[in-house]
Amino acid sequence: MRLIASSFLALALTGAIVTGPAHAADLIDFWDKPQHGGNSFNRLPPDEAYFKALSSYGATWVRLSYDKWKPAKRDYLIGDADKYEGIPAADLKTLKETLDRSDKAGLKVVITPLSLPGMRWSQNNGNKFDGRIWQDKAWWAEAASFWRDLARELKDHPGVAAYNIINEPAPEKQNGLAEHADEKAMQDWYASKKGSASDLVAFYETVIAAIREVDPATPIMADAGWYAAADAFNYWPSGLSDQKVLYSFHMYEPYAATSAPNMKREKPYAYPGKVPFGEGEQNWDKTRVASYLDQPVQWAKDKGIAPNRVVAGEFGCMRRWTGCKAYLEDVLTTLDKDSLHWAFYSFREDSWDGMDYELGSKKVHWKYWDAIDAGTPDPVKRSATPEFEPIAKRLAR
């Protein structure tokens, strides 16, 4: 795909671009009141029945990732994370058709890449972390080119509610800052990296500027660093300069308890209970959940950012973990207290059953795994369960 012609770029720089349809000007208004939805991280592009099922619970949006879909080249939509040369036409066609199905079901979509040029998602990279984009700004230019191209293609689609520039960035990883470090350590680290290729804030500004050359209206969703940790906005000196930005964090803390490895422990960490976190161990209960989740809300308040621009883009726990239902209830109680947007992880995932709450607390049927091996649609039927109840009852409100 060719990049912007010089004449078009000149129009962009002079502000002479004509906006798209009338709906474009109102896109940010969708986010003025709390919106609740789910994450779609499936290996096959979801069909209309999938989106209708999510909508039938009362969801209003879906955070859509496409990186598990079969790509035309090495990496879906970006062609090759090692060298961006345009969006493959076949990949774009499939994405647009999927957006049409979601729109028909009444769901807004947040476009969510797991990979960018210079940052291949670890699960598509032999489970190895790829942090090239945080080491060399040459990758920033390729990422900006990709997003400029994608925004040009999607800016007029009625189903798109935001562009989530990259899922769970981690410029801090293997780069001198411990996960869940204290606020001063975070701020000192950022001061030492400001202006470098590790500067997440500057990266976002660069990519947003490229998007705005072709699309002045679609909101941007920006994940915090350290895999979108709720405490990782703490080092940001301010919000981003664009006025149509949503600030997103993910909630799986304490990760040692909510994640898959805990299920393999002889005695899994319980909730409520003491769990490793950061450099030590902490007692996690509804009070600790609330205080942890207060951090992005307080950060936004301190920076003059409205609470309706803060999003819990993901949250969840292993459905077979005994503490999961109580954990979900406590997380959601806190999110709703602050009237935040949220999307649970995940809805009817066809490649991993760990946080698919409609499956209940039992092992999934063997035909689920057979379908994965065969590359065929997931045949397992879903229904509301007690494990899904904390989410379902709120979607229905």
Describe the function of each predicted region.
Residues 7-16:
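Bacterial N-terminal signal peptides
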